[in-house]
């Protein structure tokens, strides 16, 4: 008898509570969300936090994700009459926080939207209707009455170019949207159990804030002029009150460590222009996973001095083709004047017909002595997953190229005797293959071991800068192909090749699909279909633990290929 399993709808709940005088939090709890953006796997769901401040005038700080729609709006209008709402503060325009802005304005069209210049530009394109707006800059204030004086702090690139933070002098509450957040969903609205929150807090920082460490430190510098913060009202996860100093100090320390790194990549792009935002983020992910510091800057709004300073300190420069406007041409001229020979350079198209041509732009920098680290990323249609994979891998290629000398030095620095002793650890030879929709990846691996018997499980050490890393998050599936001792050379040679960004790893390789969709290598000795259960951070590697769901041996008398080393400083 066939059994049909119907996927149950995700659990979505609301939590309303007072967090400070005349200040109410509306927390939208998404218990079952398991992925946030293409690279961000979630183990503990997430929350979308929105806040009401009721002085003599009333302000709403951020809305929520559109998936909460009617239930959020019903709760909001129970807390405040639409005619009494005066301001809507948009911390930034990412849809998980601004997804219901248009709905709020439909019910309360008189409301003044308060945001940064860039955010107001984005909103105009998002909601397609006129609205009353108030642009704010760093240090601007908005007096709601009853002591609730709101001061705005500019925080670009945390993690969008339009981000602002809002400080209420009356309650000493800092509303931070994405900053200091965590994708962690539970009933406790505060950070009462730091040991439970800490892993997700760090993972969130690494994925979203770490790549912009210098911007984090700049935000801390701007916050120094404010009175002491008593409560951080985050946009995701628990609000930070009980262990606030610990969380803030962690952010500061992590960012200082990142900023001290000698290698920085600057990504210049035209925000909200074609597909610039999405492609810049994909390149940023790939670059950051190599360990370099990444700074993004909007060519259309950044000050020339900031563009020049970032260009001068960067070891690598990546440019998204901007419009052919006077502002953009001035920005490009500033980059060209500040760039110097031996810097790495890369260019990606924005997908807009009248954008600055990519190839002449790249050639200008090449002629000045800069070194292209990846081919121009072409955009001839709406981006696909394959294009985003190409962009991410291009960023990884630049990061690896910039760190090549440091990697060699680290290998040579290992004690000789210890190096030789580690080299006596041997392992089998395997190829990990993975497929997500139309995109795929593969990696030769030898640091593989059985890790459990109940359930059956394996562990694999995967370097953080490997392309396949983004295919091995919790819940992802893959195939572990075992190479045969008598027939491993052709497959090993093929998968040891350095593939250009976005290249098909399986071209001219005989495969057939596993039940989980990943490729099985026809010439492998055996294969196992696996599901990722957890990941352990091991400094420059992830230890990926996965359950084994099924498997098969193609040659019962065959033996596994073994990789014997003599030194331990490389695979």
Curated annotation (Swiss-Prot):
Residues 43-236 are annotated as: Zinc metallo-hydrolase. GO terms for molecular function: FMN binding; metal ion binding; oxidoreductase activity, acting on the CH-NH group of donors, NAD or NADP as acceptor. It comes from Thermosynechococcus vestitus (strain NIES-2133 / IAM M-273 / BP-1). It is an enzyme of class 1 (oxidoreductase). This is Putative diflavin flavoprotein A 1. Its cofactor is Fe cation. Keywords: Electron transport, Iron, Metal-binding, Oxidoreductase, Transport. The keyword Electron transport applies. SUPFAM superfamilies: Flavoproteins (SSF52218), FMN-binding split barrel (SSF50475), Metallo-hydrolase/oxidoreductase (SSF56281). InterPro entries: Flavin_Rdtase-like_dom, Flavodoxin/NO_synth, Flavoprotein-like_sf, Metallo-B-lactamas, NADH_oxidoreductase_modular, ODP_dom, RibonucZ/Hydroxyglut_hydro, Split_barrel_FMN-bd. Transmembrane segments: none annotated. Mediates electron transfer from NADH to oxygen, reducing it to water. This modular protein has 3 redox cofactors, in other organisms the same activity requires 2 or 3 proteins. In the N-terminal section; belongs to the zinc metallo-hydrolase group 3 family. Fe cation 2 binds at residues 96, 178, 236. Its EC number is 1.-.-.-. It comes from the Bacteria. By homology with NorV in E.coli, may be involved in nitric oxide detoxification. Binds 2 iron ions per subunit. Fe cation 1 binds at residues 92, 94, 159, 178. Residues 265-426 form the Flavodoxin-like domain. Residues 427-571 are annotated as: Flavodoxin-reductase-like.
């Amino acid at each position: 008898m066939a059994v049909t399993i119907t996927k149950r709808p995700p659990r979505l709940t609301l939590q309303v509570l007072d967090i400070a005088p005349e200040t109410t939090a509306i927390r939208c709890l998404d218990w079952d969300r398991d992925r946030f953006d293409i690279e961000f796997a979630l183990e503990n769901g997430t929350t979308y936090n929105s806040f009401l401040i009721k002085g003599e005038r009333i302000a709403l700080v951020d809305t929520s994700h559109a998936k909460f729609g009617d239930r959020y709006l019903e709760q909001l209008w129970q807390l405040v009459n639409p005619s009494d709402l005066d301001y809507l503060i948009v911390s930034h325009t990412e849809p998980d926080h601004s997804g219901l802005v248009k709905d709020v304005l439909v019910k309360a069209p008189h409301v003044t939207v308060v945001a940064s210049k860039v955010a107001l530009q984005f909103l105009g394109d998002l909601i397609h209707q006129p609205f009353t707006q108030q642009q704010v800059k760093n240090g601007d204030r908005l007096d709601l009455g009853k002591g609730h004086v709101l001061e705005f702090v500019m925080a670009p690139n945390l993690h969008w170019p339009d981000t602002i933070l809002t400080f209420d002098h009356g309650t000493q509450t800092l509303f931070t949207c994405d900053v200091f957040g965590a994708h962690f969903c539970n009933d406790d609205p505060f950070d009462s159990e730091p040991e439970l929150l800490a892993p997700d807090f760090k993972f969130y920082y690494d994925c979203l804030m770490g790549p912009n460490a210098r911007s984090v430190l700049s935000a801390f510098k701007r916050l120094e002029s404010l009175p002491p913060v008593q409560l951080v009202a985050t946009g995701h996860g628990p609000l930070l009150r009980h262990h606030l100093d610990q969380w803030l100090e962690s952010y500061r320390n992590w960012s200082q460590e990142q900023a001290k790194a000698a290698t920085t990549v600057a990504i210049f792009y035209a925000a909200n222009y074609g597909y610039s935002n999405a492609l810049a983020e994909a390149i940023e992910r790939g670059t950051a996973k190599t360990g370099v510091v990444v700074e993004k800057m909007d060519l259309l709004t950044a000050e020339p001095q900031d563009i020049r300073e970032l260009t001068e300190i960067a070891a690598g420069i990546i440019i998204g083709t901007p419009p052919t406007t006077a502002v953009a041409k001035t920005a490009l001229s500033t980059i060209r004047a500040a760039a110097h020979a031996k810097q790495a350079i890369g260019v990606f198209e924005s997908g807009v017909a009248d954008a600055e041509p990519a190839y002449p732009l790249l050639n200008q920098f090449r002629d000045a002595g800069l070194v292209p680290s990846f081919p121009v990323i072409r955009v001839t249609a709406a981006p696909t997953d394959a294009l985003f994979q190409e962009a991410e891998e291009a960023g990884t290629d630049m990061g690896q190229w910039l760190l090549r000398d440091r990697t060699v030095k680290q290998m040579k620095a290992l004690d000789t005797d210890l190096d030789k002793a580690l080299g006596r650890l041997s392992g089998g030879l395997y190829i990990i293959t993975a497929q997500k929709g139309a995109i795929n990846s593969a990696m030769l691996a030898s640091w593989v071991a059985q890790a459990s018997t109940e359930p059956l499980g394996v562990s694999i050490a995967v370097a953080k800068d490997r392309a396949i890393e983004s295919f091995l998050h919790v819940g992802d599936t893959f195939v572990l192909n075992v190479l045969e001792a008598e027939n491993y050379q052709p497959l090993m040679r093929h998968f040891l090749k350095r593939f250009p960004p976005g290249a098909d790893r399986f071209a001219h390789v005989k495969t057939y699909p596993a039940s989980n969709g990943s490729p099985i290598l026809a010439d492998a000795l055996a294969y196992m279909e696996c599901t990722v259960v957890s990941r352990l951070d091991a400094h420059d590697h992830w230890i990926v633990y996965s359950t084994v769901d099924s498997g098969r041996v193609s040659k019962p008398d065959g033996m596994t290929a073994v990789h014997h080393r003599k030194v331990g400083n490389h695979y």
